[in-house]
């Protein structure tokens, strides 16, 4: 897979959706596309199989995603036509990143020892959103190895306030003292 190629197609799709005022619909459709590709690895196998012709792939995509907006379907078809079907897998992620960036939204993960309530999750989103100057959409991941505290990852930035990290820092300070 060539990420830069997938990003180019994502940018073209994003630009068209923005111009046409269909960002919400395109966002929903690429989320669905992502879910379908995750749920059916056989589809990805077909898209990357050199024995399957471009016309067969195009028909498969029309049959599978023909109810989506024309710009989404046409983007998929152009990718197949240009022998870029393998990049279809990455398209939804890059489109969502562009849409989120345009809207000032960042997605991330908050790791905790136990599931956070909806209220606690919103509080974490607000606090870290203010630090980053963005609206955050965090997904809570439970990691039983986290004794307590939180680890928040947004993009390439990690805020680690777990007890494990605090103990590690304390140990280093004591050893260096």
From Swiss-Prot:
GO terms for cellular component: plasma membrane; proton-transporting ATP synthase complex. The keyword Ion transport applies. It is a peripheral membrane protein. GO terms for molecular function: proton-transporting ATP synthase activity, rotational mechanism. Gene3D superfamilies: N-terminal domain of the delta subunit of the F1F0-ATP synthase. Belongs to the ATPase delta chain family. This is ATP synthase subunit delta. The gene is atpH.
